Amino acid sequence: MAQIPARGNYSRQLTCKQAGDAWEAAARRWLESKGLRFIAANVRVRGGEIDLIMRDGKTTVFVEVRYRRSGLYGGAAASVTRSKQHKLLHTAHLWLARQNGSFDTVDCRFDVLAFTGNEIEWFRDAFNDHS
C-alpha cells in the first residue's frame, strides 16, 4: 500500500490514482475505527463513481472522500459541489437498483470524509436526495 506522507508534494511521490487510493484506504480504516462496516470501494456505474460504501447499523452510507493540502480555497469539503452531489446521487440510485433497492426502500445517507492537511472532518448526512 502507498504511504501517505504527513506533508509533501504527492505529484513527486505518488501518482494521482495512487494518492487517491491511499486516502480512500485511510478513510476506510478511519470509518471502520468508528464502527462502520465496509461494503465496497470505487463502485463505478455509468455516469459516476462512489469512493466507499459502508454500513452504519442498518444504514447504507455512501462516502465521498476528499483531500486538499490546505483550506486556503475552502478545504476538502467545499470541493463537493452541487454537480458532484447530483452525480453521487445518480450513482447511488443505480447501485441501489442493482441491489434490488431504492431510496424509498433502503435507509441510506451520504457522508463526506474530508482530509484537509492533517485534519479529518466527517460530515454525516452531508446532503440527500432532497437537496
Curated annotation (Swiss-Prot):
InterPro entries: Restrct_endonuc-II-like, tRNA_endonuc-like_dom_sf, UPF0102_YraN-like. It holds the Pfam family UPF0102. Signal peptide: none annotated. One of its GO terms (molecular function) is nucleic acid binding. CDD domains: PoNe_Nuclease. It comes from the Bacteria. HAMAP family: UPF0102. Belongs to the UPF0102 family. This is UPF0102 protein YraN. It comes from Salmonella arizonae (strain ATCC BAA-731 / CDC346-86 / RSK2980). The gene is yraN.
